[in-house]
Swiss-Prot record:
Protein name in UniProt: Estrogen receptor beta
Organism: Mus musculus
A Gene Ontology BP annotation from the UniProt entry: regulation of cell population proliferation
GO CC field: cytoplasm; mitochondrion; nucleus
Gene: Esr2
Modification(s) after translation: Phosphorylation at Ser-87 and Ser-105 recruits NCOA1.
Amino acid sequence: MEIKNSPSSLTSPASYNCSQSILPLEHGPIYIPSSYVESRHEYSAMTFYSPAVMNYSVPSSTGNLEGGPVRQTASPNVLWPTSGHLSPLATHCQSSLLYAEPQKSPWCEARSLEHTLPVNRETLKRKLGGSGCASPVTSPSAKRDAHFCAVCSDYASGYHYGVWSCEGCKAFFKRSIQGHNDYICPATNQCTIDKNRRKSCQACRLRKCYEVGMVKCGSRRERCGYRIVRRQRSASEQVHCLNKAKRTSGHTPRVKELLLNSLSPEQLVLTLLEAEPPNVLVSRPSMPFTEASMMMSLTKLADKELVHMIGWAKKIPGFVELSLLDQVRLLESCWMEVLMVGLMWRSIDHPGKLIFAPDLVLDRDEGKCVEGILEIFDMLLATTARFRELKLQHKEYLCVKAMILLNSSMYPLATASQEAESSRKLTHLLNAVTDALVWVISKSGISSQQQSVRLANLLMLLSHVRHISNKGMEHLLSMKCKNVVPVYDLLLEMLNAHTLRGYKSSISGSECCSTEDSKSKEGSQNLQSQ
C-alpha cells in the first residue's frame, strides 16, 4: 500500500548517523590547545604553531538532533578501530614533529581508559612511542579530511618530505636542499612564517621546514595521493601513510642530529622554554590537613605532572631520537628529581613556603600531620633557599632541568651491540644542553672566573636534588605499603619501576638486562591477551 505525502528524503536515525557523520568544520566548536606557557624571560618566544596541529571538535549528530552541539573530546583517536592487539591509546599517530606539539595531549584526555591496562613499563613505552599529542592527522571519519601546511599554515596539498605541506613550501624545500642555498636572516632569526609572510625571509622559512620535521628522504613517493578536494579517507589509511613515512625517515638518523647541531645555544634555550609544561591545578582539601588528605593531594598532583613530563621530555631536541627503551629508562630514573626541582623553582620567590601548585601552597608546619614528611620539607626549603641565594634565572633552571633528565640513568642504556651508538647520542645531547647553560651564564655580565664558580655551584646543587628525591621516593613507597594513600596510573608504574631497579642493583649487568627484557615481553603478552 503506497503512502502518499511521505517525504522520500526522510532519513532514519540509523542512516542519519552514517550519512551525517561528516559536518562542516565551521559549525562546530573549535579547541585550540597552546604549547606556549607565559613565563618570565627576556626573549620573545619563537612560536612554531600551525593549524596542522590543531584539534577540531565537530558537533555530534546523534543524541542531539535538535541542533545543540554536544561537547566531544578533542582527541578522537580513541574512537578509531584498534589493530587487534593494541589498546586505543596505542593507535595514536607517531608524529616526527619536535616543536609543534600542544601541551594538552590527547592520551591525557583519554586517561579514563588507562585503568584497564596492566601497570608495567609497556604503558610508559606506548606513551613515549606515540606522539603524546596532536599529530598532523587528527580527524577521524566524523570530520572533514582537511590538512594544513606545517610550515606556513596554508592548506596542504599532500604529504611531502615527511610532513603535510603546501605546494609552495614543498617546492621551496626542494630548491633549498638541491641548490645548497646559504640563506641569511636580515633580522634576528625569529621571523614569523605564515601564509602571507612565508616569502619574506628564506632563512627562517628553511629553519621552520627543518623544525616541523621536513627531511630529505621524505620523497614524493610519500604523498599518499592526497588532494585538497573533499575526498574521504579512512583513519586506517592515514595511520598507514604516517607509519610509512616514519619507516623511511628512520634510514637517515643523522638528519635530526644535524638539526640539533644547527641550533645555537640561544635557540636551544628558547626551544626548552617552548617545551615547558603548564601549571597543574589540584583542589586543596578541607582544613585541617590529615595524613590521608595531604598524601592524596600530593599523589594526585604528581600523577598529573608525570603526564606533562613525558610531553616535555619529547620536546627536548634529540630526545625522541634515542631508542624507546632509553627514553623509558631516563624518565624512570629522574621523574622524582624533575618534580622536586620544579617545586623548588615555583617556591624560589616564597621563602618558607612550598608552592606545589597555584592552589596548593604549604607551610613547613603543615607537614607535621604526615609521618616522615617534615624532614623532606626541611630539605626542600633549604635547597630552595640556596637557589634563591644564587638568584637562579629562569633560563638556567630550564637547562638544569634538562640536564637532570639526560644525566639520570646510572645503568647501561642499551645492549652491548647498541651501547656505543646510544651513548654517543646521549652524550651529544647532554653536551648541547651543557653548552646552552654555559651560554646563559656568560650572558649574565660577570667575569669568566665568576662564571666558572656559578656553573660549579649550580651543578653541585644537583646532588642535593637527587638526595631529596631519593628520600621522597622512600617516603612515598612507605605510604603505599602502609595503605595510607592509594597510588594509581602512571605514578604507580614509576614507583614499580623504581622498586624493580632497586632489586636489580644487586644483580650483574647481564642478568639485569635479561630480567628487564623478560619483564617487557611479559607486559607485551599481557596487552595482547586483553
